[in-house]
From Swiss-Prot:
Reaction(s) the record says it catalyses: choline + A = betaine aldehyde + AH2
Active site: residue positions: H513
Deleted gene: phenotype: Decreased testicular betaine and increased choline and phosphatidylcholine concentrations. Only one of eleven males was able to reproduce, impaired fertility was due to diminished sperm motility.
Binding of FAD, residues: 44-73
Gene Ontology cellular component list: mitochondrial inner membrane; mitochondrion
PTM field: Acetylation of Lys-498 is observed in liver mitochondria from fasted mice but not from fed mice.
Underlying gene: Chdh
Domain of life per record: Eukaryota
Positions of post-translational N6-acetyllysine modification: K486, K498, K582
Protein name: Choline dehydrogenase, mitochondrial
Enzyme Commission designation: 1.1.99.1
Cofactor: FAD
Family stated for the protein in its record: Belongs to the GMC oxidoreductase family.
Protein source organism: Mus musculus
Length: 596
């Protein structure tokens, strides 16, 4: 129930702000020139961004008592007076929409008008709080397909194939069903399996089987293809972000300093060697120096922005903004990839959806139960079933993802539901449309120019037609007949290719999976930003560790892969041998001659 106990919306636009409240390699902008300067401090590592990756790094790097780590976060803590209950908007799973409605914990980004989407400006929420987007997301734990990582290896991220990534997924994870060759059993990140007995979830899974798709016991295990119960980063009725998993348990370590509400104004360089960062906190300018490395973990928007503001990026673009060039690296901000999705919505003829949970008294009851015992409808995000299928014959592994919700979502949940309804979120996983982001100005507080270039290829347009048609086919099965009312979206009048294409352009939205803007690859690749060791190419003592370094977007949600990336990078940074497991089987369809 994406609306339960939703917060007050503070306004359509956020205060302009960039990551790491980012960096610039030149004098401070007018808004901060009056800031006083204070002294010098030195650390082994400075990690910029306490999000899905940064929290992992802070924990793993401080396991060595000889490593002194400074963790800088632009947003606030995810606790209020040390309490999760008092910060229920973050920790109550069903309240996830609260933080999509304002900018308190959210960068509140927007794209440029998209030519392929009727010139619409799309909303891109990103976490600005301890835990980053793992404190705002829908808590769906999906790793992607094994072939995604083998593709990374082929694309130049050597040593990032499935055999070398799976052990780090397991290392991070503590699955409630216990360990096996795919799952971890003793990691910090609690993962639970969807287990609702809601009749609409049960009917959806049955309808998928009736449509000819298999049931998969574990879409993160042997067989991704099919429909089944989702894994969730929910533990004992509470969101289990990377802040909960990795940061909270280590805050007492004497070799970790974690700062919040901190605007990093630039990475400090001596020549091409990163030596520290400059940041602003409480109206004062500080410099933190490193004996080893600065690590950027701000995500796919903030990390490239931080690099460009620091003079690392396309030299021509930097000079236009009078930013001194440290290193010409034209791939920074390029290769932007995201998952687009549409909602196919059906009216429900029975009063069993989450529509009633929007009523004020019901909201209060749900909230009180959760505050008292962490149970009830507030203890889940309700996206507990879903699936992965191949769009057509010849596709070797799933390229369409489904999330089912026994409710209706309008405008990212920022508008209340209208009626009893259910929906499937459906989208293609490996779009061919690729975008970019660039600096809007040399002011680190300005959001960058974000241009994802959605639906710019005919292949992507055709794939979304398939998404709509295949969703309708599942919704038309007998299992959903007792609940099926009229189709709300796209609507029964939308049938032809042209009509479906128009619907998709008018209604598709981001699935909140921006990635790939600091592409990992070979140093000989002119589009690469970091090498397979996560080091920024062309400079020294600087790494990027987050979803921005993915060479290509994976076939699924991005939080689990981002945690894996940070776990693997931590071993690389510490000089540990890479974990590897070559003997884990992965399902392959018996034939590619058919779509299912």
């Amino acid at each position: 129930m994406w609306q339960v106990l939703r917060g007050w919306r503070k306004g359509w636009q956020s205060p302009r702000g960039a990551l790491a409240w980012a960096v610039q390699g030149q004098p401070c902008p007018p808004c901060s020139r009056a800031v006083a300067s204070v002294g010098k401090d030195e650390y082994t590592f400075v990690v910029v961004g306490a999000g899905s990756a940064g929290c992992v790094l802070a924990s793993r790097l401080t396991e060595d008592p000889n490593h002194r780590v400074l963790l800088l976060e632009a947003g606030p803590k995810d606790l209020l007076m040390g309490s999760k209950r008092l910060q229920w908007k973050i920790h109550m799973p069903a309240a996830l929409v609260s933080n999509l409605c304002d900018d308190k914990y959210n960068w509140y980004y927007h794209t440029e008008p998209q030519p392929g989407m009727d010139s619409r400006v799309l909303y891109w929420p990103r976490g600005r709080v301890w835990g980053g987007s793992s404190s705002l997301n829908a808590m769906v734990y999906i790793r992607g397909h094994a072939e995604d990582y083998n593709r990374w290896h082929r694309e130049g991220a050597e040593g990032w194939d499935y055999a070398h990534c799976l052990p780090y997924f397991r290392k991070a994870q503590r699955h409630e069903l216990g360990a096996n060759m795919y799952r971890g059993g003793d990691g910090p990140l609690h993962v639970s399996r969807g287990k609702t007995n809601h009749p609409l979830h049960q009917a959806f899974l049955q309808a998928a089987r009736q449509a000819g798709y298999p049931f998969t016991e574990d879409m993160n295990g042997f067989q991704q293809e099919g429909f089944g119960w989702m894994d969730m980063t929910v533990h004992q009725g509470k969101r289990w972000s990377t802040a909960c998993a990795y940061l909270h348990p280590v805050l007492s370590r004497p070799n970790l300093r974690a700062e919040v509400q901190t605007l990093v104004s630039r990475v400090l360089f001596e020549g091409t060697r990163a030596v520290g960062v400059e940041y602003i906190k409480d109206g004062q300018r500080h410099k933190a120096y490193v004996s080893r490395e600065v690590i950027l973990s701000g995500g796919a928007i903030n990390s490239p922005q931080l690099l460009m503001l620091s003079g690392v990026g396309n030299a021509d673009d930097l000079r236009k903004l009078d930013i001194p060039v440290v290193c010409h690296l034209p791939g920074v901000g390029q290769n932007l990839q995201d998952h687009l999705e549409v909602y196919v919505q059906q009216a429900c003829t029975q009063p069993i959806t989450l529509h009633s949970a929007q009523k004020p008294l019901r909201k209060v009851c749900i909230g009180l139960e959760w505050l008292w015992s962490y149970t009830g409808d507030g203890a889940t995000a309700h996206l507990e079933t879903g699936g992965f299928i191949r769009s057509r014959p010849g596709v070797p592994h799933p390229d369409i993802q489904f999330h089912f919700l026994p409710s209706q979502v309008i405008d990212h949940g920022r508008k209340p539901t209208q009626q009893e309804a259910y929906q499937v979120h459906v989208g293609t996983m490996r779009a061919t449309s690729v975008g970019w982001l660039k600096l809007r100005s040399a002011n680190p507080r300005d959001h960058p120019v974000i241009h994802p270039n959605y639906l710019s290829t005919e292949t992507d347009v055709e794939d979304f037609r398939q998404c709509v048609r295949l969703s309708r086919e599942i919704f038309a099965q007998e299992a959903l007949a007792p609940f099926r009312g009229k189709e709300l979206q796209p609507g029964s009048h939308v049938q032809s290719d042209k009509e479906i294409d128009a619907f998709v352009r008018a209604k598709a939205d981001s699935a909140y999976h921006p990635s790939c803007t600091c592409k990992m690859g070979r140093s000989s690749d002119p589009t690469a930003v970091v090498d397979a060791q996560t080091k920024v190419i062309g400079v020294e003592n600087l790494r990027v560790v987050d979803a921005s370094i993915m060479p290509s977007v994976v076939s699924g949600n991005l939080n689990a892969p981002t945690v894996m990336i940070a776990e693997k990078a931590a071993d690389i940074i510490k000089g540990h041998p890479a974990l590897e497991d070559k003997n884990v089987p992965v399902y392959k369809p018996q034939t590619l001659d058919t779509q299912r």
